[in-house]
């Protein structure tokens, strides 16, 4: 009986988690109409795997006046999406400080579902920015304060958008800019070369990726003076994604005159989300101060 009740509760939680996702496109680009194998599991954290149909969940901070909006890309090595502690939980925090949030359920790269799997997540991120600006009036969003945020591989996706916003991969409405106004990256994968997270690279590009593609997705190589301002957080003892990823990205940003701030923890490892339990210091508070300093919020 207890096992039955536990199963029902788990299913109920999962239904609540997924009921809010809306279609990202009218017609999905770069898509093979194969059986949808999306699945989910709760094992300490909520994970979504095999996403082939992208979606979004919009969390409103109120409709009294236009507010900033952050698009959140959960991490998961381009294999799964940690959609709760790196997604919906973060969205609720942003709402508490007067920022709308959109959690992006981006596609997991798959040869079964995409003719060109390596660009599918970037297409979804570009579309998400476009969508927010399309609905700016209805959703009470300030279209000049639309940011992108990502954790781990989601940070790679977010930074890919930040440096490749001018390489349009979608055909929805090219009159609307897909350039984010700011970026927030949590223990991000940045480079696909020296400091690469091999799993993320293989899942996105495949085992036989070319040097040109690895360079394209080594985002520190594509920073320029028009790259959006950035806030990053990383722990020195991260054994999954070395902190050097954040170091080289911040160096590239500052070398190009782009405002960037890196919050460094001595410990914390990888995947701590909003709260690093090994430290009394709050990177979330530092991020809020950074948002205020850059006049994104008051």
Regions found by a protein language model. Name each.
Residues 231-234, 238:
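Short beta-strand/loop motif that positions the catalytic acidic residue
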Residues 84-102:
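Short amphipathic alpha-helix adjacent to the substrate-entry channel of hydrolases
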Residues 67-75:
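Short beta-strand element of the alpha/beta-hydrolase
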Residues 43, 188-222:
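Mobile cap/lid helix-loop segments that gate and shape the active-site cleft of serine hydrolases
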Residues 247-298:
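C-terminal catalytic histidine-bearing segment of alpha/beta-hydrolase fold enzymes
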């Amino acid at each position: 009986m207890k096992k039955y009740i536990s199963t029902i509760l788990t299913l109920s939680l999962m239904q609540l988690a997924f009921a809010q996702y809306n279609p990202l496109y009218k017609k999905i680009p770069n898509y093979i109409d194969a059986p949808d194998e999306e699945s989910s599991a709760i094992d300490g954290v909520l994970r979504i795997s095999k996403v082939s149909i992208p979606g979004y969940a919009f969390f409103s901070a109120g409709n009294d006046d236009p507010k900033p909006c952050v698009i959140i890309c959960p991490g998961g090595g381009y294999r799964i999406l940690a959609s709760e502690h790196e997604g919906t939980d973060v969205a609720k925090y942003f709402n508490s400080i007067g920022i709308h949030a959109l959690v992006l359920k981006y596609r997991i790269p798959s040869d079964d579902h995409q003719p060109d799997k390596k660009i599918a997540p970037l297409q979804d991120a570009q579309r998400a920015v476009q969508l927010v600006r399309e609905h700016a009036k209805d959703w009470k969003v300030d279209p000049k304060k639309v940011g992108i945020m990502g954790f781990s591989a989601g940070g790679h996706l977010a930074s890919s958008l930040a440096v490749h916003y001018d390489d349009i991969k979608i055909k929805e409405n090219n009159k609307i800019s897909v350039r984010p106004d700011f970026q927030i990256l949590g223990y991000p994968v940045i480079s696909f070369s020296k400091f690469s997270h091999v799993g993320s690279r293989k899942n996105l590009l495949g085992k036989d990726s070319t040097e040109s593609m690895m360079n394209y997705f080594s985002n520190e190589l594509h920073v320029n003076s028009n790259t959006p301002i950035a806030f990053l957080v990383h722990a020195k003892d991260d054994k999954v994604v070395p902190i050097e990823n954040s170091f080289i990205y911040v160096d590239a940003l500052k070398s190009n005159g782009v405002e960037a701030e890196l919050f460094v923890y001595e410990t914390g490892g990888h995947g701590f989300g909003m709260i690093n339990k090994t430290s009394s210091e709050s990177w979330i508070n530092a991020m809020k101060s950074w948002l205020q300093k850059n006049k994104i919020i008051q």
